[in-house]
Structure formats: C-alpha cells, structure tokens
C-alpha cells in the first residue's frame, strides 16, 4: 500500500465493496476498513459517499475503456470479431458480482443526481465505439444494414446489461451465452450476398 496513493487505494477497495454489497449496503466505514485507512482519510479526499461513488464509476469506466481500446478499436480485426472479442474479454473479468455501471444504474439512478449524471456521461461515451464498429461492419457487408447503427449499439449495451443482471440472479453464465447466441447468430449477421456487392 505504501506505493499506492490513499485516494486511489480507497477507490480500488471501494469498487470491490460496492460490487460485493451494493451502494446502499456499503457504509464509509466498510470502505475504509477494506482499505485499512482511518475514516478521516476518506473525507480528506472525498466530500461525501455520493461523490466517492461518482469517482468510483469514473475509474471503473476508465478500466473498461482500456478493454474497448484493445478490442472494439482494433482496426486490424474484422468488425464482428471485434465485438466478439469485447464481450469475451468482459466475460473473463466477471465474477458473479455483475457490472458496477449496471448495478449503480439499477440502484442509484433514481436516487442520486450526481451518480445519474455520471452514468449518462458514461453511456454516451460507451456507445460510440460500438456505433463505429457496427458502421464498419455494415460497410463491409458483415452486419445487417436494415437497422441504424445507433439503434443496434444501444440495444447491444442494454441487452448485455440485462444478461449480466440475469447472470447475477441465476448464478451461472447461461444468460451471457444466450445473449451471444442471439446477437451473433440472429441479430447482427447480414443476409446480403456480399459477393454480389459492388
């Protein structure tokens, strides 16, 4: 811990506490206990638990953006494969506690304007690389063209979050496998004959 700034250490440990207990089930004392720092240290860095939650979301999405960069934005890989690589990478990191973005969306968006504003910002940024990837797939004929890229991108994220929620409830990954089957075998594939395209 000596090499880790207290603020960042609190965020890292707080993320785990929120994933395990939820926002409402986590007290500041739980977070400081997990981080093994005095409670006063928390308020030296964060104005409130709500502000801390917003910061945790920012950090969580920053980590997610690294996965986005290495998968969805990898131009050396065909668009559909990029999408598959993204979901495969996320599945590797899931441990049954779900996605913090989805968890906070369900639990806090009706209660906290601070968190809701941060969630809106995150979803706005999150959808863009999906849209870009889908557009490229439509241009090459590997993804259906009869649905708008923004509609498909929004649906992918929304249905993925729903699959993660089901995974938490059922305590197995079958909902994730069902999502992948429907998306990549039924929803996205183009029915066009690519060889006849000019």
Curated annotation (Swiss-Prot):
Pfam families: TetR_C_13 (PF16925), TetR_N (PF00440). One of its GO terms (molecular function) is DNA binding. Gene3D superfamilies: Tetracycline Repressor, domain 2. It comes from the Bacteria. InterPro entries: Homeodomain-like_sf (IPR009057), HTH_TetR (IPR001647), Tet_transcr_reg_TetR-rel_C_sf (IPR036271), TetR_C (IPR011075). Keywords: DNA-binding, Repressor, Transcription, Transcription regulation. Residues 4-64 form the HTH tetR-type domain. Transcriptional repressor for the dhaA haloalkane dehalogenase gene. This is HTH-type transcriptional repressor DhaR. It comes from Mycobacterium sp. (strain GP1).
């Amino acid at each position: 811990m000596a090499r880790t700034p207290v603020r960042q250490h609190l965020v890292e440990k707080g993320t785990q506490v929120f994933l395990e207990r939820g926002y409402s089930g986590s007290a500041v004392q739980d977070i400081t206990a997990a981080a093994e720092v005095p409670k006063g240290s928390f308020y030296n860095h964060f104005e409130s638990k709500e502000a801390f939650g917003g910061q945790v979301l920012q950090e969580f999405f920053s980590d997610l953006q690294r996965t986005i960069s290495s998968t969805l934005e990898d131009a050396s890989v065909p668009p559909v494969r990029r999408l598959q690589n993204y979901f495969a990478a996320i599945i590797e990191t899931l441990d049954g506690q779900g996605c913090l973005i989805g968890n906070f969306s369900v639990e806090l968006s009706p209660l906290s304007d601070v968190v809701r504003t941060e969630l809106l910002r995150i979803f706005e940024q999150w959808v863009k690389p999906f849209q870009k990837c889908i557009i490229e797939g439509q241009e090459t004929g590997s993804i259906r063209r009869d649905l708008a890229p923004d509609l498909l991108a929004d649906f992918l994220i929304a249905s993925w979050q729903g699959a993660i929620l089901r995974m938490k409830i059922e305590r197995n990954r079958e909902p994730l496998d069902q999502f992948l089957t429907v998306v990549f075998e039924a929803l996205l594939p183009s029915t066009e004959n690519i060889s006849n395209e000019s």
